[in-house]
Amino acid sequence: MVIIRLARGGAKKTPFYSVVVADSRNRRDGRFIERVGFYNPLAKEGQEGLRLNNERIAHWRDNGAQLSDTVARLVKQAQKSA
């Protein structure tokens, strides 16, 4: 099954997440198909904390990809702020 989820990056105690399309059998930070955005939970004021490519997310959802709970929340948040 293909899933759209967060892959953790960044240094210790400073998380940075990539929003990726991956096979659910692969590790969280492992191999992925496509990177469709990023999420920075520690973004300072004036910095971009969330960027999603909604066209590509819609494309993958139409082709059967599932959203993780956190990514679904972020997509809803991005649509509300846009």
UniProtKB/Swiss-Prot annotation:
Domain of life: Bacteria
GO cellular component: a single term: cytoplasm
PROSITE patterns for this protein: RIBOSOMAL_S16 (PS00732)
UniProt keywords, alphabetically: Ribonucleoprotein, Ribosomal protein
Pfam annotation, one family: Ribosomal_S16
GO molecular function: structural constituent of ribosome
GO biological process, one term: translation
HAMAP family: Ribosomal_bS16 (MF_00385)
PANTHER family found in the cross-reference section: 30S RIBOSOMAL PROTEIN S16, SMALL RIBOSOMAL SUBUNIT PROTEIN BS16M
Family that this chain belongs to: Belongs to the bacterial ribosomal protein bS16 family.
Protein name per Swiss-Prot or TrEMBL: Small ribosomal subunit protein bS16
